[in-house]
Amino acid sequence: MILTYHTQGEVIFWQFQDYAPAEALSIGTQFSNVSCYSLEQTPYNSSFAGYKDWFIQNYIRPGYTIEVGRGTNPLPTSQFDKIYRDNLGILVLGALL
């Protein structure tokens, strides 16, 4: 499994075309539940360019891009505590899976 991080949107992208394995949706739902980020399929126009997409296609293993924070990049450091709290559960759960 791979977790990649970007800074924009408070959303988790989990799918790449039809390559993600069956358990990917269930794991993504768990990540969404512990973070309160929405779980969404990767928009077509955003596909084909990310490490997550390459990983899913080549290894047929779950992969997730987690978009943290809101606003104009670079995000202000004042968002750090919220981003940390929102993502701690994902990191712990990801390590246990």
For the regions a language model picked out, list residue spans one by one.
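Metallocarboxypeptidase
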Residues: 1-97
